[in-house]
Amino acid sequence: MKKIFLIFPNQLFKIKDQFSATKNIALIEDSLFFGCDLQWKQKFHCQKIIFHKATMNYYEQVLKQHGYNVIYIKHKRETRTEENLNYLKEKGFNHFITYEAHDWSLEKRIKNFSLKNNIILETKRSEMFITSDDLSDEIINQKKAYGMQKFYRNQRKSLNILIEKDGSPTGGEWSFDKLNRKKLPNSIKVPRLPTLGTSKFLDKAKKDVSINYQDYYGRYESFNYPLTHKEAEKWLDVFLIERFNLFGDYEDAIHSDHRTLWHSIFS
């Protein structure tokens, strides 16, 4: 049995023990994330492509430093996920390990390909969300109608977040949405986002996009997002120290001179 762990652009989690079953890792620039998919033909903003390419190149380096064998499959236009999976099949892999996809098309394609080609498919819990797919389905299927307010209330209870001993919400209310709609005062000073320097991953991604994605939307000169785990942790620290205290107050505020206000720019 030849196993390989499939990793897509939104699954670059910190390396712990999740790859204990195999040393073989496939990093896949799938067209569902990079655009011009054979079925879903939309193009994306060029900064999205830069972000995915830079972070995946960084992750490839980290994996190799940890001793993993990495197969990096680059994005090709007018393709589907199945072509990438077939490439791995032709290399002799017959046991795919994946995270929960959190993408309907991607999940369906992987499952159907595995079934048709006698591939063993093993799915692991994703770190992307606090609640697993199975638990989310179980909660939602209990009611005919299920809105986000009910879901968040259930999350508070099941995770025991800001819940009193008698089961009531801390502060006496389940939602403080009405307090999130303050207007931005003219005199208030809006904190700046951290400024990230250049890196070989960013430079390589920008060059790739400038050559191969000229027809995609937007401009990339203003790109300023964390690309490594260390940068993301620093970005989180800055958010908690400088922005979190007023995030709730101005969560719904907008201003023509400021793009981010007190938001974290994490999701």
At which residue positions do the language-model features occur?
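N-terminal beta-strand-loop-alpha-helix module at the start
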Residues: 1-75
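Substrate/cofactor-recognition hotspot
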Residues: 2-11, 16-18, 171-267
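Short, flexible loop/turn elements at secondary-structure junctions
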Residues: 9-11, 74-77, 100-102, 240
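Surface-exposed, flexible loop/turn segments at secondary-structure boundaries
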Residues: 13, 33, 78, 104, ...
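Conserved aromatic-histidine-acidic binding/catalytic patches
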Residues: 44-51, 73, 98, 102, ...
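Well-ordered alpha-helical segments embedded in enzymatic catalytic cores
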Residues: 55-58, 80-84
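Glycine-rich, often proline-containing surface loops adjacent to acidic residues and nearby aromatics
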Residues: 60, 64-71, 90-95, 212-219, ...
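Beta-rich, aromatic/charged-enriched effector core domains that present basic-aromatic interfaces
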Residues: 81-225
